[in-house]
């Protein structure tokens, strides 16, 4: 199976390195002897044993014999939860950190340091861009406005505050009026920084107003994600039919979608179920194991039996927003030495 083959290729070097490191210990096993086999979605990974049932539930109510599907981490379950396992689909998770997963039709032309290669639960190749920072710095600025409102003696509804500030950002200039934000609570490997300092930068002649201020921080939340995905879409010419967004950035209806659509120049969909995340994703993989009577592919099973054609609410990018974000990201990349200097001189 392609998933098994790819996983073996990706892990063989690490296995050999591990075996070499533990060789002086004289263990009677190799790493491959004790690790479970890699299985694609839909394969039976075993059954819950009586001993296992007792460990999970000492009361004895949990019965043995439950079939077990192959496990997945956040990336795999996120793809399933957003119906993004088919080639030419993808998903973006945007919260405290962010990552995009684009399911490829073919391998990339060469390796890229900022792009990780993984697979869907059923074995398709996926290009992953992971960013350490997303909404944390943005949330810190929102909390500053919360403090100001409290100082005035005005009751604060956080949902209303987020909604008003996020939506006001859309009234700003498409290029944020020259304002730049680096949301680096921690370092960002994609931009080559091992450490980070949250930084807001402007020139005296930039258009400094609240709308542009909020817009630059929203742009910053997906700025690094854009840099990584520009490689896929502009250099590798990757094609996608649908990208689904999920996570806290999309909680204020329409705003995060529009910002992300401008960043990667692609329509973005958001589904009501996307917020369910990993637990729901692995439950769907369990359902695929036991309820796939028609022997469908995972993509077809999700499309027909789970989502039933529901692609969510889609927002397409405007030419003005795309051009503005492109200008913003050029200013952003040009200013990265300022961010790097901040990590050296601000402790």
Residue ranges and their predicted role:
Residues 13-122, 255-260:
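ATP-dependent carbohydrate kinase catalytic cores
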Residues 6, 37-51, 69-70, 102-347:
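Glycine/Thr-rich phosphate-binding loops that ligate phosphate moieties of nucleotide
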């Amino acid at each position: 199976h392609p998933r098994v083959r790819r996983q073996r290729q990706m892990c063989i070097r690490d296995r050999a390195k591990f075996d070499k490191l533990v060789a002086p210990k004289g263990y009677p096993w190799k790493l491959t002897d004790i690790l479970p086999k890699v299985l694609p979605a839909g394969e039976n990974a075993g059954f819950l044993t009586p001993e296992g049932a007792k460990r999970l539930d000492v009361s004895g109510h949990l019965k043995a014999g439950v079939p077990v599907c192959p496990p997945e981490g956040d990336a795999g379950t996120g793809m399933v939860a957003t119906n993004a396992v088919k080639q030419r689909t993808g998903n973006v998770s945007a919260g405290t950190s962010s990552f995009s997963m684009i399911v490829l039709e073919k391998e990339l032309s060469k390796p890229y340091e900022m792009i990780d290669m993984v697979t869907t639960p059923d074995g398709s190749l996926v290009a992953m861009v992971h960013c350490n920072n997303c909404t944390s710095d943005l949330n810190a600025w929102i909390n500053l406005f919360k403090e100001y409102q409290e100082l005035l003696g005005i009751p604060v509804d956080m949902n209303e505050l987020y909604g008003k500030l996020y939506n006001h950002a859309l009234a700003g200039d498409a290029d944020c009026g020259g304002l730049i934000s680096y949301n680096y609570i921690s370092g960002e490997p994609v931009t080559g920084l091992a450490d980070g300092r949250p930084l807001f930068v402007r020139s005296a002649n930039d258009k400094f107003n609240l709308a542009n201020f909020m817009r630059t921080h929203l742009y910053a939340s997906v700025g690094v994600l854009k840099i990584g995905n520009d490689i896929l879409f502009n250099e590798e010419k990757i094609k996608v039919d649908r990208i689904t967004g999920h996570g806290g950035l999309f909680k204020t209806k329409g705003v995060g979608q529009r910002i992300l659509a401008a960043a990667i120049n692609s329509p973005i969909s958001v589904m009501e179920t996307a917020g369910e995340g990993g637990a729901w994703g692995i439950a769907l993989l369990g359902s695929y194991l036991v309820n796939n009577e028609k022997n469908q592919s995972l993509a077809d099973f999700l499309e027909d039996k789970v989502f039933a054609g529901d692609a969510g609410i889609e927002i397409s990018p405007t030419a003005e927003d795309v051009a503005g974000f492109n200008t913003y990201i050029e200013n952003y990349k040009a200013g990265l030495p300022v961010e790097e200097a901040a990590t050296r001189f601000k402790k």
